[in-house]
């Protein structure tokens, strides 16, 4: 036996063979090094997802990485054929750069053209792209071994032909790869492997093909076998107890040492040596880029010459065309800038052009300019800017951004630092609805294979892995759920703690003692925990990055990254994740979908329809006091970035009065500034509570906009430049160092700063103190460029809410249409603004929320928002589109008319039911109860009508030749069942709309809740004095029960409705138990304390009382912040009432001998109690009765004037 000098693993699956390979790459690299091996290959199933991760990790450990994949190959000449279901495995390895690019191409085509259950290539494609590639016959699923293995019954059944066919196929591969095709032999102790073993050796002798010894490695250590089996079960949705599931018959698929392999293949030591031969042949060195030594190649703009010629210009290169467009763009921008400042702008522009040109980024800027230009030309809303790009005047001149960097003191160096080589990063916000159009434009512009979105890998993180493993081990759902809930809800939490940069980061095991108790007391929980520890952070599945796009204008992307086809989007995606794209010389562009831009666009369209005007945001008065009054009031629901409770409180405290204040609010509204005291300093100095002082007079122009407080990163840079004498480029490097908190770098820079200050004539000690202050606040400093750009959207939305609140709130509601809970929340806000929302109805509603004018009782036009049909839960877009298109020919006059006109191939029973429940079909002649009981009958009639109309069209009928054709008339045979009671109607409305329309659930308890005094209304909670007590009355709509992360005890979040809106209370274990003793179907009284957390007023629950107990309590008067408030009658928000709804018309029952005088009294009372419910008179005459509709609209309070009479809610 020859001495085994070396061995290389050439058949290895990492974590990128998703939920099949369980080799975590970094652990794998250390193990390979530990075993003394000098090289190792990766052969993931059908993909190259992990190639660069593998390459860099192995290089870091001093191991030679061999890049490969285990391809799936079929024998049809048509790559995309679905006729051939049979596929085989084949291992491929990149010898050199040519082989690497061929491998990336093959992997790309396998997904983009050959995918059928698996990513496949064929021999035709392989022949064309085999240069620089080594191949081996793979495992038992390889084509050669498949035909050899006639011992396997399944193989025989599906066409395994034996040795001769196997030899013929091996020779085909030999012809393709010549000396670079090897026969692979494995010895895992599997019977089928033993059967083919001697045949492979025989074939080697007959053909001259060399043999390599491999171990089909799926996990790192022998004891990882069971965990890998669990991972396979997760992938297949199986449990360990499922019979017939796919599993390995032996536990030999780990990283074996050279010694173990030598022992296994003692009879053919050359098979081990040949693995090293392959390793020696593979000389691939991937040219990986980095910012410091080997920067990425800046992209070029493919269309410079064509664009220039189209404009009658003669520019051949990106740089000259870019400079021209920037200068021309600035001329347009300067129209709004005072003339005395023009030189300043021109100088700044030339400086930026020079830096961008020297750094070779004109092509990048032109690519961004082009897609934003296209978006604006197509009417696709684009944000005013995002991130540090807003600090560039060039970006402003090119209309990439819409914020003037000089006006707001934004720094170009924050975007591009000439003293630090780094790629530019311009992120762009687009209308969420139309973002896809920009991606389609890029694909059309640069080519199908030159543009791709970016892959992401979802990992088995702490909570998720516990749930996955528990399911595989058949742990009961409740136990698994409780176990997972013990994992603390912290960002980046791990199951166990770990060391990082000399610091121990605690994990769930250290933070939650109950985990240890459970694991040590429960054997099944112990198994779940151990397997979870093994599988934690393993890649689970592939996804698509929400924003990133890569573009190569010169070559197809597969020259730099293999490509993948996303099942979710159908689009092309990189196989390499974000982290590895810049190293392979690709630059990403972020295309973000921003919902607020869609809201603004919808609002502007409604405004144009309603008012026949176009709002020009670029000419808004940025000092408009009415807009600032809206923000100061805290009434900021719907206003971009500042609508949360925390921001509402901050706005009230800070009372912004300038655009600079809005920029600051966005920067300050984060946990760091809130906790550091920055916010208090800012507010107190703005309002004169504290004096504004500057350590150096030179700081005043820098810190004046923020009242002497350091808020922005740009201010840090300017201070370092102005006081310490640094360049802005150096100042940016210091800013970055401060963020990293490197003590040595900070100390060195402090000395340099103090020395620089002295050289400029400043006091050294004062400079040292200033440095310490900068360091303190630098950690909380925000990017002003980003804050300023987003403040622009904040101002725009505040402007719309101030001047066009109906249109703006209608657009807001539309944006939330697919989330019923959000619609309900915004409806409450709309009501608080005293805007009426008309309920949905097929004769008045559009797809989206809309604005329309209705006549009030005085005959005046009154603007209202109309509920969109698209916001009704469960209806769907197709039936709504059909209903609205048909309605354009005239309103629906009856249910029969509706059925005869609507297409019932689109309107199904599932869609019709929520339309009925929501009240959208009221006034078509039948009650909701009747329609709901006859849904099948209605749908049958609709389908029969569709069929009859189809038969009557064209040449299919005697009637087809008649002009205009004919329509099948619908006749319904339905018995009137009357209407549901009020409670059922309200429940149906809440189910489909998320709100109550025809009344309030408390209406039925009017008598029980009479007489209570000093109760606080939900709309007044924020007006109460902090620390005071309050009693509120309401009905619990829902209690969401949860388990505390630390305590492990149950708690609940209760949604409670009163007559004026909703409020929320947290219920702890004791209160949850108390609730079980109470009837939650009835109103309850809640004793609370008013508290404030992070600027948000909250209720802390003390006690829950039923109405009987509450009557025995002397409820004290609530204490308001404004004493005058207690004297006011606070506005009530009434429930939304139905629009001319048969379910909410109000009728008074009278005898036929009623006197005219009494009728006059009714009319007077009706005018006093005007509302939205049609008033009917029901006149009784012996055994008959007649219903008369008046022209009066009333509210519920009219009943109080005629208590002795019978009243009916008409359906």
UniProtKB/Swiss-Prot annotation:
Principal localisation: cytoplasm
Keyword Coiled coil found: no
GO biological process: DNA replication
Compartment annotation: Cytoplasm
Top EC class, one word: transferase
Record field: catalytic activity: DNA(n) + a 2'-deoxyribonucleoside 5'-triphosphate = DNA(n+1) + diphosphate
Gene Ontology CC terms, in alphabetical order: cytoplasm
InterPro entries: DNA_pol3_alpha_NTPase_dom (IPR011708), DNA_pol3_alpha_thumb_dom (IPR041931), DNA_pol3_finger (IPR040982), DnaE2/DnaE/PolC (IPR004805), DNAPol_HHH (IPR029460), PHP_dom (IPR004013), Pol/His_phosphatase_N (IPR003141), Pol/histidinol_Pase-like (IPR016195)
Enzyme nomenclature, EC number: 2.7.7.7
Keywords: Cytoplasm, DNA replication, DNA-directed DNA polymerase, Nucleotidyltransferase, Transferase
Pfam families: DNA_pol3_alpha, DNA_pol3_finger, HHH_6, PHP
GO molecular function list: 3'-5' exonuclease activity; DNA-directed DNA polymerase activity
SMART domains the record matches: POLIIIAc
Domain of life: Bacteria
Similarity annotation: Belongs to the DNA polymerase type-C family. DnaE subfamily.
Purpose of the protein: DNA polymerase III is a complex, multichain enzyme responsible for most of the replicative synthesis in bacteria. This DNA polymerase also exhibits 3' to 5' exonuclease activity. The alpha chain is the DNA polymerase.
Subunit text: DNA polymerase III contains a core (composed of alpha, epsilon and theta chains) that associates with a tau subunit. This core dimerizes to form the PolIII' complex. PolIII' associates with the gamma complex (composed of gamma, delta, delta', psi and chi chains) and with the beta chain to form the complete DNA polymerase III complex.
NCBIfam families per the UniProt record, alphabetical: polc, PRK05673.1
Protein name: DNA polymerase III subunit alpha
Organism placement in taxonomy: Bacteria, Pseudomonadati, Campylobacterota, Epsilonproteobacteria, Campylobacterales
């Amino acid at each position: 036996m020859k001495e085994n000098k070396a061995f290389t693993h050439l058949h290895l699956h990492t974590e990128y063979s998703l939920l099949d390979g369980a080799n975590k790459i970094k652990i794998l690299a250390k193990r390979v090094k530990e075993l003394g091996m000098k090289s190792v290959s990766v052969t993931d199933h059908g993909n190259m997802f992990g190639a660069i991760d593998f390459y860099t990790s192995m290089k870091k450990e001093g191991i030679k990485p061999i890049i490969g994949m285990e391809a799936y190959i079929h024998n049809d000449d048509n790559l995309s054929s679905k006729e051939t279901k049979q596929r085989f495995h084949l291992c491929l390895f990149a010898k050199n750069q040519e082989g690497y690019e061929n491998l990336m191409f093959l992997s790309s085509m396998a997904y983009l053209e050959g995918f059928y259950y698996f990513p496949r290539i064929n021999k035709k494609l392989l022949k064309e792209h085999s240069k620089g590639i080594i191949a081996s016959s793979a495992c038992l699923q390889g084509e050669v071994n498949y035909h050899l293995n006639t011992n396997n019954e399944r193989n025989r059944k599906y066409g395994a032909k034996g040795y001769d066919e196997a030899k013929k196929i091996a020779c085909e591969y030999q012809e393709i790869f010549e000396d670079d095709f090897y026969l692979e032999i494995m010895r895992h102790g599997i019977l089928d492997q033993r059967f083919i073993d001697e045949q492979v050796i025989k074939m080697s002798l007959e053909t001259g093909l060399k043999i390599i010894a491999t171990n089909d490695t799926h996990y790192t250590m022998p004891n990882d076998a069971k965990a890998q089996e669990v991972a396979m079960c997760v992938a297949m949705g199986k449990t360990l107890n499922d019979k017939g599931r796919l599993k390995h018959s032996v536990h030999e698929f780990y990283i074996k040492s050279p010694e173990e392999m030598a022992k296994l293949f003692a009879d053919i030591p050359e098979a081990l040596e040949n693995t090293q031969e392959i390793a020696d042949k593979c000389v691939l060195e991937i040219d990986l880029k980095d910012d410091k030594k080997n920067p990425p190649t800046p992209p070029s703009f493919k269309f410079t010459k064509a664009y220039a010629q189209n404009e009658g210009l003669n520019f051949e290169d990106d740089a000259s065309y870019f400079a021209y467009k920037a200068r021309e763009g600035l001329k347009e921008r300067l129209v709004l800038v005072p003339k005395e400042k023009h030189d300043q702008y021109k100088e700044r522009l030339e400086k930026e052009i020079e830096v961008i040109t020297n750094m070779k980024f004109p092509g990048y800027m032109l690519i961004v300019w082009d897609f934003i230009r296209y978006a604006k030309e197509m009417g696709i809303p684009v944000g005013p800017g995002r991130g540090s790009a807003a600090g560039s005047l060039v970006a402003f001149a090119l209309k990439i951004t819409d914020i003037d960097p000089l006006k707001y003191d934004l720094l170009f160096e924050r975007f591009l630092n000439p003293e630090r080589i780094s790629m530019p990063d311009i992120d762009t916000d687009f209308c969420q609805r139309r973002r896809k159009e920009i991606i389609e434009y890029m694909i059309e512009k640069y080519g199908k294979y030159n543009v791709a979105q970016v892959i992401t890998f979802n990992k088995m993180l702490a909570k998720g892995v516990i749930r996955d493993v528990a399911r595989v081990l058949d742990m009961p759902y409740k136990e698994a759920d409780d176990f997972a809930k013990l994992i603390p809800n912290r960002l980046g939490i791990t199951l166990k703690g770990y060391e990082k940069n000399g610091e121990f980061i605690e994990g769930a095991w250290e933070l939650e003692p109950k985990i240890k108790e459970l694991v040590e007391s429960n054997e099944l929980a112990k198994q779940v925990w151990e397997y979870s520890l093994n599988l934690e952070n393993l890649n689970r599945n592939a996804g698509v990055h929400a924003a990133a796009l890569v573009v190569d204008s010169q070559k197809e992307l597969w020259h730099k990254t293999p490509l993948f086809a996303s099942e979710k989007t159908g689009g092309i995606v990189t196989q390499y994740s974000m982290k590895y794209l810049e190293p392979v010389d690709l630059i990403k562009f972020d295309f973000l979908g921003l919902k607020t831009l869609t809201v603004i666009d919808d609002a502007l369209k409604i405004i144009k329809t309603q008012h026949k005007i176009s709002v020009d945001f670029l000419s808004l008065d940025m000092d408009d006091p009415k807009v600032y009054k809206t923000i100061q009031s805290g009434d900021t629901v719907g206003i971009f970035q500042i609508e949360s409770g925390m921001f509402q409180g901050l706005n009230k405290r800070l009372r912004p009065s300038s655009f600079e204040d809005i920029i600051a609010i966005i920067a300050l509204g984060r946990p760091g500034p809130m906790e550091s005291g920055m916010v208090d300093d800012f507010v107190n100095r703005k309002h004169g509570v504290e004096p504004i002082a500057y350590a150096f007079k030179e700081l005043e122009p820098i810190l004046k906009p923020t009242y002497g407080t350091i808020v922005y990163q740009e201010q840090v840079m300017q201070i370092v430049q102005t006081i310490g004498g640094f360049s802005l480029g150096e100042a940016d490097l210091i800013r970055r160092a401060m963020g990293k908190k490197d003590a040595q770098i900070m100390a060195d820079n402090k000395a340099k700063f103090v020395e620089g200050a002295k050289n400029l004539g400043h006091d050294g000690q004062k400079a040292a103190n200033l440095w310490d202050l900068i360091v303190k606040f630098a950690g909380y400093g925000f990017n002003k460029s980003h804050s300023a750009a987003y403040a622009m959207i904040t101002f725009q939305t505040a402007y719309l809410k101030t001047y066009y609140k109906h249109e703006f709130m209608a657009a807001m509601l539309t944006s939330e249409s697919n989330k019923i809970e959000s619609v309900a929340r915004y409806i409450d806000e709309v009501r608080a603004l005293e805007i009426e929302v008309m309920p949905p109805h097929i004769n008045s509603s559009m797809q989206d929320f809309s604005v329309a004018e209705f006549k009030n009782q005085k005959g005046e036009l009154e603007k209202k928002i109309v509920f969109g049909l698209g916001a009704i839960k469960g209806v769907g877009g197709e039936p709504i589109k059909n209903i609205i298109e048909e309605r354009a020919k005239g309103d629906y006059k009856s249910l029969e008319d509706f059925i005869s006109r609507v297409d019932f191939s689109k309107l199904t029973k599932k869609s019709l039911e929520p339309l009925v429940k929501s009240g959208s079909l009221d006034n078509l002649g039948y009650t909701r109860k009747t329609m709901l009981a006859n849904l099948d009958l209605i749908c049958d009639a609709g389908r029969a009508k569709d069929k009859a109309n189809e038969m009557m069209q064209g040449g299919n009928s005697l009637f087809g030749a008649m002009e205009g054709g004919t329509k099948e008339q619908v006749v319904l045979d339905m018995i009137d069942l009357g209407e549901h009671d009020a409670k059922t109607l309200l429940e149906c409305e809440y189910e489909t709309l998320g709100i109550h329309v025809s009344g309030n659930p408390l209406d039925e308890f009017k008598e029980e809740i009479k007489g209570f005094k000093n109760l606080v209304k939900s709309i007044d909670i924020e007006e109460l004095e902090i620390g005071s007590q309050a009693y509120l009355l309401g009905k619990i709509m829902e209690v969401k029960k949860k388990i505390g992360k630390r305590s492990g005890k149950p708690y609940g979040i209760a949604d409670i409705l009163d007559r004026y809106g909703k409020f929320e209370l947290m219920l702890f274990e004791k209160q949850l138990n108390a609730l079980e003793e109470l009837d939650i179907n009835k109103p309850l009284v809640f004793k609370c304390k008013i508290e404030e957390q992070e600027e948000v007023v909250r209720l802390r629950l003390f006690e829950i009382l039923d109405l009987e107990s509450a009557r025995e309590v002397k409820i004290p008067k609530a204490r308001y912040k404004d004493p005058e408030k207690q004297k006011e009658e606070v506005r009530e928000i009434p429930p939304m009432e139905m629009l001319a709804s048969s379910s909410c018309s109000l009728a008074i029952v009278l005898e036929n001998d009623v006197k005219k005088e009494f009728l006059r009294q009714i009319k007077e009372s009706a005018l006093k109690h005007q509302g939205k419910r049609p008033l009917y008179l029901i006149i009784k005459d012996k055994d008959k009765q007649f219903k008369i509709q008046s022209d009066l609209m009333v509210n519920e309070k009219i009943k109080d004037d005629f208590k002795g009479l019978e009243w009916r809610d008409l359906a």
